[in-house]
Curated annotation (Swiss-Prot):
GO MF assignments: (R)-2-hydroxyglutarate dehydrogenase activity; FAD binding; zinc ion binding
Residues annotated as transit peptide in the record: 1-10
Residue positions binding Zn(2+): 457, 464, 498
SUPFAM superfamilies attached to this UniProt entry: FAD-binding/transporter-associated domain-like (SSF56176), FAD-linked oxidases, C-terminal domain (SSF55103)
Protein name as catalogued: D-2-hydroxyglutarate dehydrogenase, mitochondrial
Activity regulation, short description: Activated by zinc and cobalt ions.
GO terms under cellular component: mitochondrion
Enzyme class: oxidoreductase
Length: 544
């Protein structure tokens, strides 16, 4: 028997399946109409009704540690021979961006510290340009004066790539936040690099489209930073990476040259595809100032299922069944272990809507036919329940319920940040070995680690491995590295699936790339930024 049709007369509905149901029971018998709110939550908004990412400055970091150690005091890094900003420099930059040269120490404190509060620079200057020409003038001046520049968007990165290491000038794109054009037939959006991802999502959704990427940090991250790090996120399974959806870029090179490759064409087979050099380059080759991106049509029907699985083998089999049965409507398949759910409950007060399980999966479908999607989803759920792959679950289709269920996955990073110091690893691994490292590390680290958790994007083989401790520990770091990277290399995996390398991971690039590739990367850097002023100390290994 198929699942009941999902029709508008069911406002804010939630369906649950219980493991106590007998084998062979129909899907209808395994469902019940959910309550208006999940136990453990407040009113209709409460902990669920807000954006998943807590704005900068309002997370619990201040209650954990009032001061973050300066990066050079924690890491063995030496300042390169760049010039120091002088009063004459400040006067010259003030003429370029009048009233937008920030030197106040209080205003400079947040952009000097990363969101995870693990690295801290000592920049004395932040610039806020509004236009590409202002960025060009800034970089031209800094190139002539040999002043290092740290491009910065929403500063939501995980690897220290968006914060200065020493006293680099911070070039913020926060005021470059205008939509330049949108074509409502092709779905091509052209915008400045400082547009916040969530604001762009709202803009295109009002016009019947969606952004091809979605991140837990969408309330703060900038599209320019997303492109500069080739951010993956929650929709890669359906829409692919930004290397496929970004059509064109406008980039300012280190010497102030404006490279305008801001095409809106889906097909352009003329010469080298230069935009690919800057996608994922983390601001080391040029400053992205504008983006042309292809937005897919907004689905008229979205469903989210949150399911409990008895083991990781069942998670993999559920994914295999999901791809086979849901096919063209499958848009996301996320997984998380029980430790993740415990931390979300402990630090954020969010209740798990299903019975406790060793693993949980979140599945999103998106399509244009409510009846068609409901029928396919019903068949899938009946299959995984009857086969024992899934022991319990809940399903939502209205916007509020969907946000509630997604918050359980999207706010894991926030929960981890409240648990102590976090050692974060963003790995690509073969699916059948995706979770093995988590159990391996629990045995290896023992009580020296507070928590070892694993979650991520199963659809594209991306594991987010996180280890927490009360405070930073060199002995714990020594037990983790290089062991994690050697283990990953042994599986022919990648040491960075989507977060990039930034400052904290730059020296492990060799675990994923051969020496010949590293040499070519250095040559490209020297060609486009001969003085090395753009985001120094990032991405490329310190030593050749």
């Amino acid at each position: 028997m198929m699942m009941p049709r999902l029709v508008p007369r069911w406002p804010a509905w939630l369906f649950c399946w219980r493991a106590a149901c007998i084998q062979g029971a129909s899907v209808r018998q395994k469902m019940w109409a959910g309550p208006s709110k999940i136990p453990g939550l407040g009113g209709p908004r409460g902990a669920w009704g807000t954006s998943p990412l807590v704005p900068r400055g309002s997370c619990s970091a201040s209650s954990r540690t009032p001061e973050v150690t300066l990066t050079p005091e924690r890491y063995p890094v030496q300042r390169l021979p760049f010039s120091v900003v002088s009063e004459d420099d400040l006067a010259a930059l003030e003429r370029v961006v009048p009233g937008r040269v920030i030197t106040d120490p209080e205003e400079l404190e947040p952009p000097n510290v990363d969101w995870l509060r693990t690295v801290r620079g000592s920049s004395k200057v932040l610039l806020r340009p509004r236009t590409t020409q202002e960025v060009a003038h800034i970089l031209r001046y800094c190139h002539e004066r040999n002043l290092a520049v740290n491009p910065q968007g929403g500063n939501t990165g995980m690897v220290g790539g968006s914060t200065p290491v020493f006293d680099e000038i911070i070039l913020s794109t926060a005021l470059m936040n205008q939509v330049l054009s949108f074509h409502d037939v092709s779905g091509v959006l052209v915008c400045q690099a400082g547009c916040v991802l969530e604001a762009l999502s709202q803009y295109v959704e009002e016009r019947g489209f969606i952004m091809p990427l979605d991140l837990g940090a969408k309330g703060s991250c900038h599209i320019g930073g997303n492109v500069a790090t080739n951010a993956g996120g929650l929709r890669v399974l359906r829409y692919g990476s930004l290397r496929g959806t970004v059509l064109g870029l406008e980039v300012v090179l280190a010497d102030g040259t404006v490279l305008n490759c801001l095409t809106s064409l889906r097909k352009d087979n003329t010469g080298y595809d230069l935009k690919q050099l800057f996608i994922g380059s983390e601001g080391t080759l040029g400053v992205i100032t504008a983006v042309s991106i292809l937005c897919p049509p907004k689905p008229s029907t979205v469903n989210v299922a949150f399911l409990g699985c008895p083991g990781f083998a069942e998670v993999l089999q559920t994914f295999r069944t999901c791809r086979a049965m849901l096919g063209e409507i499958l848009s996301a398949f996320e997984f998380m272990d029980a430790e993740c759910m415990k931390l979300v409950r402990l630090h954020l007060g969010l209740s798990c809507p299903v019975q406790e399980s060793p693993f949980y999966v979140l599945i999103e479908t998106a399509g244009s036919g409510p009846g068609h999607d409901a029928e396919k989803l019903g068949c899938f759920l009946e299959q995984v329940l009857d086969s024992g792959l899934v022991t319990d679950g809940t399903l939502g289709s209205d916007e509020r319920r969907i946000k509630m269920l997604w918050a359980l996955r999207e706010r894991i990073t926030e929960a981890l940040s409240r648990d102590g110091y976090v050692y974060k690893y963003d790995l690509s691994l073969p699916l059948d070995r995706l979770y093995d490292l988590v159990g391996d590390l629990r045995a290896r680290l023992g009580p020296s680690a507070k928590h070892v958790v694993g979650y991520g994007h199963l659809g594209d083989g991306n594991l987010h491995l996180n280890v927490t401790s009360e405070a930073f520990s060199t002995s714990l770091l020594g037990a983790l590295e290089p062991y994690v990277y050697e283990w990953t290399a042994g599986q022919r995996g990648s040491v960075s699936a989507e977060h990039g390398l930034g400052f904290k991971k730059k020296d492990v690039l060799g675990y994923s790339k051969p020496p010949e590739a590293l040499q070519l990367m250095r040559q490209l850097k020297a060609l486009l930024d001969p003085k090395g002023i753009l985001n120094p100390y990032k991405m490329l290994p310190t030593h050749a």
